[in-house]
A protein has these predicted regions:
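Metallo-beta-lactamase
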Residues: 1-171, 206-274, 295-301, 351-371, ...
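Active-site neighborhood of phospho(di)ester-bond hydrolases with catalytic His/Asp-centered motifs
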Residues: 142-143, 174-183, 204-207, 272-278, ...
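Active-site-proximal loop/helix segment associated with metal-binding centers of metalloenzymes
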Residues: 147, 242-267, 384-407
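Active-site metal-binding motif and surrounding structural segment of the metallo-beta-lactamase
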Residues: 156-204, 292-298
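Phosphate- and divalent-cation-binding pockets in alpha/beta enzyme and binding domains
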Residues: 187, 211-215, 283
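Active-site-proximal loop/helix segments of hydrolase catalytic cores
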Residues: 191, 246-325, 346-347
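Binuclear metal-ion centers of metallo-dependent hydrolases, dominated by the metallo-beta-lactamase
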Residues: 202, 217-235, 290, 305-308, ...
Length: 460
């Protein structure tokens, strides 16, 4: 095909894709009152870092040429995949299978189920998507809390919940620490943050993200901004922001001043890892060597696509990352709650179970809202199959899902634990949080105190 003809053909393709996109947007507009057409919750865009917070961002070794950089070269979108082609895929491909065919069997969590301390000292409750309540030795940590109906700056459009929240936020009870992995709408929810800010929680966030929280009314002294490999001690826990392979984007204008991260949370008896959103990179083994082994890992297994293969794990990659981290029990998350990728709704669970069985990994796949203790994980019963929109005659990836395998998978040697440092016995004010900043080959080498900008002040 000659070059002019090729360009004409491609222009025709793009025009067709644009037509499909505009058709679907037009249908959405037709169902709305006219006064809703331009209604945008502009506060949800957040705010850019300023002052001391911006100074900390600019001084990060991971901030290069005006924006944060990933641990390895990364493309948010794969080459050859135009935004219009992406939108066409998300809107048109296999649409009937991207949502459940019936109501998701959510476990209606009652406050009484959380009133008794866990026997082992560690309990996890997956509340949907990346939201997990972790109870570690009497301290309650809430990861990436999202209670809103849509993950969008709009009230009328954007990814909508596929199942209700298992527990109203008002019934959750006190939260000690809120941990945010990055500023995407499905991980950082303005309305949920504002509600949680009415309590006494301290908010741990990656560098720059605290600007959003402060814009929404969270007092600066309650915000702890951390760079990769920095740690803070809160309420007897040590929280460390660890690298991830992703990106941030929230407002109408691009900004590279917000960091993304995974998280390590340690008590005197237990260790947890939360992946946030991330693509595959070699750093999982490094994190496992420094901080593992982990009692449980919470791993992103959904919202993957050939369009963005470098910024979201596939289920198979998530299982391998769990092994590299030295995890004992893996909790798959970031699937089943919002329709964010072209894959079928149930596919992340099926592929995760298949990969875990092949690798001999202990898996816990509870219904949303069902608490469990990693010391005694529940059998991996495939509850999702009852509501999946699986075509007649289609084969499932895992015909049977047996009980979990033993905690130490065959052929897996757990990483050596990192030397423990003293943990605070009582919850300090965020302005007095001690931070630990490890070097590449050392567990830790310096400490500072948290300033009013929400981040550690390094000693002169």
């Amino acid at each position: 095909m000659s070059r002019p003809v090729s360009w004409l053909f491609r222009a025709g393709e793009l025009a067709a894709e644009a037509g499909l996109l505009l058709r679907d947007v037009k249908r959405s507009y037709r169902t709305l009152p006219r006064e809703s057409w331009h209604r945008v919750r502009t506060d949800a865009f957040g705010a850019d870092p300023r002052g001391k917070r911006l100074h900390r961002v600019s001084g990060s070794p991971h901030f290069v040429d005006g924006s944060f950089r990933n641990p390895v070269p990364t493309r948010p979108l794969a080459y050859g995949h135009t935004p219009l082609a992406l939108m066409r895929t998300k809107l048109a491909v296999d649409g009937g299978r991207r949502s459940p065919a019936a109501a998701v069997p959510v476990h209606r969590l009652l406050p009484a189920e959380l009133s008794t301390p866990p026997e082992s000292g560690l309990r996890l409750t997956w509340l949907g998507h990346a939201t997990v309540l972790a109870e570690l030795d009497g301290v309650r940590v809430l990861f990436d809390p999202v209670w809103s109906e849509r993950v969008s700056p709009f009230d009328w459009i954007g990814p909508k919940r596929l199942h209700p929240v298992p527990l109203p936020l008002a019934e959750l009870g006190p939260v000690d620490v809120v941990v945010i992995s990055h500023d995407h709408y499905d991980h950082l929810d303005m309305d949920t943050i504002r509600t949680l800010a009415a309590g006494d929680a301290v908010f741990a966030v990656p560098l720059g993200v605290g600007a959003h929280l402060e814009h929404w009314g969270v007092e600066p002294y309650r915000i702890v901004d951390l760079d990769w490999w920095e740690s803070a001690e809160l309420d007897g826990l040590r929280l460390t922001a660890t690298p991830a392979r992703h990106y941030c984007s929230r407002g109408p204008r691009p900004s590279g001043k917000f960091l993304w991260s995974s998280w390590v949370v340690e008590s005197k008896r237990h260790r947890l890892f939360h992946s946030g959103d991330t693509g595959w990179f070699p750093g999982f083994a490094d994190i496992g060597h420094r901080f593992g082994p982990f009692d449980a890992t919470m791993m992103q297994v959904g919202a993957y696509s050939e369009h963005w293969p470098e910024v979201h794990l596939t289920p198979e990659e998530a299982v391998q990352a769990h092994r590299d981290l030295g995890g004992k029990v893996m909790l798959p998350m970031h699937w089943g709650t919002f329709n964010l990728a072209p894959h079928p709704w149930e596919e992340p669970a099926e592929r995760t179970v298949a990969a875990a069985q092949a690798a001999g990994v202990t898996l816990a796949v509870p219904r949303p809202g069902k608490p469990f203790e990693p010391a005694d994980p529940p059998p991996a019963a495939p509850w999702w199959r009852a509501v999946a929109a699986t075509p007649a005659g289609a084969d499932v990836l895992v015909p049977e899902a047996p009980s979990p395998v033993p905690d130490t998978p065959a052929g897996l040697t757990a990483a050596a634990p990192r030397p423990d440092a003293p943990l605070a016995a009582a919850k300090p004010a965020a302005s007095a949080v001690r931070t630990v900043e490890p070097e590449a080959a050392a567990a830790e080498h310096s400490s500072g105190r948290s300033g009013q900008d929400g981040g550690p002040v390094r000693p002169a």
